[in-house]
Amino acid sequence: MKLSIIVPFYQMAQDGKLKYCMESLLNQTIGNGESAAERAAGEVYDYEILAVDDCSKDDTYVMLKQYEADHPGRVRALQTPVNKRQGGARNLGLANATGEWIGFMDGDDWAAPDMFEKLIVKGETTGADVVGCDLHQVHEHTMEIGTIVNANTMDQTGVLDPEKYKKLMLNPCSMVIKIYRRSVIAENKLTFPEGMFYEDNCAGPVWMLSCKHFEKVEEPLYYYYQDQSSTTHFISEQKCLDRMRAGELLVEQCRQRGFYEPYHTELEFAFAKLYYMNTLFTYMIGVKRQRISFLEELKRGILREFPDFRENPYYQKEFDAEQKKLASLHMKSSLLFYVYYKALTAYRRLFHGQGR
């Protein structure tokens, strides 16, 4: 088996999203020996779709079992015993995967017909152990060109060295636009955090730092569906806590795997951005019932791991003067930060019709 594509699904029986995703994977150009890549290689790039239902309460699993029955040998329907969120569903897929390459997709996204052919060809011809591409951001189910997002940069590619690892720590980019050699995953015992949102904030950098050769296809081959009505776009305190936990797990993994010291400055920035700054402002914007005690917990966490994060050169460059001013105020007093932020937001809404 050349490729295993792992796709978690949860409560996807309605709206046709599951079907659109699955059909895009079933209609890949590889798997029948007739693609240009397969003819050139003299072999069939056979692939399997590991469709994992994350203990849905609707008919998602029933639909996946029907796909399995209709496409034996191509689709394998799996189900988690309890809801483990995306990381747990992916881990179940990994445990059952047989492909030389492993790819991931989110259940409400889809792939261009030649996505996996092009990624595999790039990996097979270069000897890379991870291959990525760019993506489309779309708001409807279509194969038309959307907003193109250029993901990883070409200066991150090739045989990886310390400078490239630093760039990948700073910007690993999404895992769903990549395929990974299963041998690298197995050798490094790579998995995903379970039972939480933002699992990629931990897994993404760790997986990239565990690889030795990264290549990229400079084409948007993945369609990322942005449904603003989806609950995944709503901010809750639990999601903020999950983001914080993902940051803590990233630091733990880097310590255990020997990445902490050589990439300390980059890790400090990644933690400051993902754990602290993103959480601070999304919490203040999106959570309805805010607590000073949460702001205190967030402050304790960043100061415990990286007390001098505000001196980080990447931090100084990434964030604007107002963001850094607000963070400094938070470091002085969570209460003062809260009062000032609320007053600033109210003022802007009143006089300018905006709010951070």
What spans do the regions from the language model cover?
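Cell-envelope/extracellular polymer assembly enzymes that use nucleotide-activated donors
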Residues: 2-6, 48, 202
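Short, well-formed alpha-helical segments that are part of the catalytic scaffolds
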Residues: 11-38
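A conserved acidic beta->alpha catalytic loop
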Residues: 24, 53-62, 82
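Short beta-strand/loop segment that forms part of the nucleotide-sugar
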Residues: 29, 33-55, 76-80, 107
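Glycine-rich, basic loop-to-helix element that forms the pyrophosphate-binding segment
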Residues: 80-97, 104, 118
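Donor-binding/catalytic cores of nucleotide-activated saccharide
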Residues: 110-215, 225-235
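Nucleotide-sugar-dependent glycosyltransferase catalytic core
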Residues: 195-196, 204, 213-246, 260, ...
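Membrane-interface aromatic/basic loop that binds lipid-linked glycans or pyrophosphate carriers
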Residues: 286-356
